[in-house]
Amino acid sequence: MTQSQQLRKLAAQSATAFLVAALCAFPLYIDKFSNLGVVKFTAVCTLCWAFALWLGALRAVGAVPQPGRLPWRQDTALWALGAVTISGVVSTALSLSPEASFWGLGGYYGGCMMVLFTAAGYLAVRAFAPQSLLNGLTFGVGVTTAIVTVLYVLNIFNIDLIGTYADTAVVERAQFFSTLGQKNFCSGFMAFALPLVFYAFLVARGVRHTVLYGIPAFFGGLALAVVDAEGLALGIGAAVLVLLCQRMFTTRTLRRLAVIGGFFFFHAGWMQYMRTHVYTQGGKPMLAALGHVGQTGFLVCLALWAVLRFALRGREVPLYRLGRCVAGIVVVGAVVLTVLANCWPSFPSLGRLDDVLIFNDDWGTYRGTAWRITAASWLDQPLWRKLLGVGPGMMHTAVANWAGADITDRMKTFYAAHNEYLELLLTTGVVGLAAWLWFVAAHLRKAAQNWLRPGVAPVTLALVSYLAHAVISIRVSMIFPEIMLLFALLQVFCLPPEEAAVQEKPARHAKKQKAAAPAEQPGLVRQWLPPITAGIAMMAACGAASRVIFDFLF
């Protein structure tokens, strides 16, 4: 093995450790609630820069990425990344408060610095992450999901095992759970984590893998039943609709979906019982309303699983045509009902669905108010600010300037638009929003062209879920770095298998040689123990170092 190959192998191991630290360890990193936002931001900022600089140093001394990893001239995704970065820098330089926009002080630390370090992390992962890490990384995300969910449930019932909220009033804790803090941040994590966890269970073969990925899926069903956020329901629903349209959707997939449905209805029924018999602080998730029919739903899922398991006797029947019809009916039906509910005054009430379909200032826990004032603030800006924005994190300031003396107490509570795309329009302008949509479209187009390659489907579903979730949520430092790393992983998985790509073609008239014996693959423990250990250690070290490096932010 040449020195360049050794350096490339070290870089691949480092990129794996980086992904473990960011996707599995970082969601569990926490400090006191009063500093939760800055603690999470400074820790992940230090982590991303540390790994990006380390991988950059390896590249400088000879660790050359595989061919096709960073094709600057042909790849529109890289140009889109440059556009996103430049638009963020320009909008920060022209911001209402450049210093606040650089650090994101006015908007959950989602400022220019986050754009810069996530771009660096994206390039580092895309350059060196190995294609063979999906199964282990997915299992790690599943373990993290289970831990986050359990802590979330315990905090709902006022049980704080790790003392995180010891200094926080009980009334405040009603809105803050687990290690990610506020419930909407938890829903953002679950929006991309649950599709990875559920997909691994859907495609698992054999008893060992089914049980291995079934345990995180069981806790994923619990997360769906307890995480109090409409965005999670929207994100998971969008991912399911995309899954139904794929050729891989068969009776076997439906059977596994029935098992996941059984997990969900079991937990929803249990939570309904607990809410009626035990005091809880948490709100009531939209999906938890199905707890009223928890027993019926569980039995229906069990019956569906039994029919598909025993009646078909192991045969797999394609269902993607039916799935596409169902997805089309759901989308068209939702659009028609929304239009009728909002535009036809005499349209009959649909009960609780009215809270979802009818848009007004009270929609989605006053998200309607946030959307209205954000749009009005953008329309009130001069043309050049419409194009370039008021600066990252400046939504609250822009709204205050627009409303003036007419600002209400409700308006004062919003530091984000609760719609990532609408907030980008205000803070980075038409240019910034267009750059981000270009970046997203370039990646999803590449995913559609390479859907059948290993790893593409689960990562795409995770990103689709997050992008749908972002319609009614906010971009924060707790979640966005992981999303950028998933975009980078998607590009890695879309490439042809690199083992086949590096095989040398034999000469035209050369004598045929016997194929070399395949290299012995290391065991799972030997393969994953070093990156897991390194990832956890780096997360701990970067978390501690961030308190010193970014002391001025605390």
Residue ranges and their predicted role:
Residues 1-9, 62-74, 283, 311-323, ...:
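Membrane-interfacial, low-structure loops and terminal tails that flank and connect transmembrane helices
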Residues 3-32, 44-57, 82-93, 111-123, ...:
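Alpha-helical transmembrane segments of multi-pass inner-membrane proteins
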Residues 46, 163-170, 354-383:
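Extracytoplasmic loop-helix module adjacent to an early transmembrane segment
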Residues 55-71, 89-103:
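Transmembrane alpha-helix boundary signature
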Residues 76-79, 182, 374, 417-419:
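Membrane-interface coil-to-helix junctions
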Residues 173, 371, 388-391, 414-422, ...:
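Alpha-helical membrane-protein architecture signal
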Residues 182, 366-413, 428-432:
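TM-adjacent membrane-interface loops and short helices in multi-pass inner/ER membrane proteins
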Residues 340-354, 538-554:
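Hydrophobic alpha-helical transmembrane segments in integral membrane proteins
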